[in-house]
Amino acid sequence: MAYTVELDIAGRQLRLETGRVAKQADGSIWASYGDTVVLATAVASQNAKPGVDFLPLTVDYQEKAYAAGKIPGGYFKREGRPSEKEVLTSRLIDRPLRPLFPEGYYFETQVIASVLSSDRTGSSDVIGITAASAALAVSNIPFLGPIAGVKIGRVNGEFVVNPDLETLKGSELDLVVAGTADAVMMVEAGANELPEATMLAAIELAHAEIKKIVAKINELRVLSGNKPKRSVVTEQIAPDLAVQVKGLVAQGIRDAIMIPNKSARQERLDMILKETIDKLKNPDDPNRERHVKIIFHGLEYTEVRNMILEKGSRADGRGPADIRPITCEVGVLPRTHGSALFTRGETQSLAVVTLGTTDDEQRIDALEGEYTRTFMLHYNFPPFSVGEARPLRSPGRREVGHGALAERALKPVIPSKDQFPYTLRIVSDILESNGSSSMATVCGGTLAMMDAAVPIKEPVAGIAMGLIKEENRVMILSDILGLEDHLGDMDFKVCGTKRGVTALQMDIKIGGITPGLMHQALEQAKAGRLHILSCMQKALEAPRTNMSAFAPRIFTMKVKQDKIREVIGPGGKTIRGIQADCGVKINIEDTGIVTIASVDGASLEKAKEMVNRIVEEVEVGKTYLGTVRKIMDFGAFVEVLPGTDGLVHISQLAHHRVKAVSDEVAEGDQILVKVLEIDRQGKIRLSRKETMPAPTGAGTKDQTSG
């Protein structure tokens, strides 16, 4: 039997239905919002994975081409590997769901959100969050939700709930919030340098809408039978073993976590753990080693948090609001277009900028339609950055997600195409990592663009904030280490300029965060961001005025649309000839925008002149160096511009009387001519004698007729 709930959100009907499709899944939801339809399913294995002590959760978001009435491209004509948007949306759904599974739940669980119909409004991501949560809520899978997702835009100073794509184009905010009825669990935002107070107000508005949706999901859960959740049996560890381990390692852990160097600290902790396992070996207990590890890591978790909460001290000796030492270098690679090495503590990013032409734009065919990207940021996290040896693979979800966050942070300061007609690619290679590598990418990317003479509006910096919360004891941390990210309760990344926020990303591991704590974290992040910006500007205060000698020079001009065909020539002959002759790249858009690119300035000027000659229109009174194309009895036809001929009448060839045209000019000669007239039919009358010095001597008469 099917059960349905409905709710009006921002003037469109949100409909959640269960019991009609995918009934063999543990939970399934058919969610519709406008004409967008998302099917979300949740399935968990019946038995926990043996030896697993983590949540084996997989979340997949997929867009069916048929949802937008399309057939996939490529040879096989079917959906292939996930697109970047699908990867990012999978992460967007995963992040708020993951903390809401109970401790000790180690059953393999898969959540799939499939877009079956798209009205091209761009709402499928937040519907995916809501539908996935609802699928878990109506299932028997243990889940501490439900949650819901809402998008907020801001146009003309007013907030807009779940804006469509057209509205977002003019919006200074693109914010996605997911949360329970009680608290916010996840934030993902891009903004045009908005104040912290505005960001907080938008998050609070989103949470108010989330509460309404969560209430409807709970209503649907009751309607559909309120399935009892599976019991989660946590592994029992002998209390006397816990006492033994604590006695052996507690002081050693306290000493080890105060070692500032990450590698040395981890080496010491690993040694203590190994010694403890060796001391407490029991051949009759096959789980002994695993239990010792669980107890040990639990003690490490407790000691790190207690040290911060009780002493206000961190593993590297900093206070809660302190930033690690920063060094910035620019121009570190001689042949690249722009480069920077940004180091903060034990985290280091090598950021490199490459400038390209319109040929280098990324063309994307999405459900919402085709579009191009002229700015790209790619983040790489090689294994050596954390002292590991493992095979190199194509970028994973984490790398795609970190790159997208840094790209979103920098995008608001990128100049428009009119100001800077380049395709811009930034690559961030993480050379070492101990937390906040995505934020190092933002800082390094800013410096690399400035080194490449990209006229950015303002420098951007990023900082990762953390939270340690035990009941009423709370500590917010600035510029968190990997250890604090792993053992803390929040990862809150804030990027922006001195004027305001350009990107936010927040993930909570506990039951949520209150607006008060969020406000405190944003204000502390602002102070840290301004400090980082001041360090960056000591290395390079403003974008360079001169580009690298190895970067392409680009000239942009606009021609009349009826001239495009002339520039291209029959079968592309003309444009290919110019490119071959001058060693340049030329791109012509349907709008008449012509882009000429070359590393060599002289070649650029030559190509520019050749294009100008093609598109130039003849002007009355102007003198041209033309080529005689044909001789007739009554005059000569002269090509003054490519493809444009005019007639020099025999009477206009010279000041003296001309008996035969061939006496003065021959085909192929180049002569100066002046335009006398362009008649209604477009015929051009030229004169050669008007460009020649007047004859001297009394009584000399010009030939005036012919």
What are these regions (language model features)?
Residues 1-233:
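Long, basic N-terminal domains or extensions that often function
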Residues 27-29, 122-140, 330-353, 434-454, ...:
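Conserved phosphate/anionic-ligand binding catalytic regions in large, soluble enzymes, centered on
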Residues 140-260, 449-545:
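Mobile "lid/hinge" segments at catalytic clefts and subdomain interfaces of large enzymes
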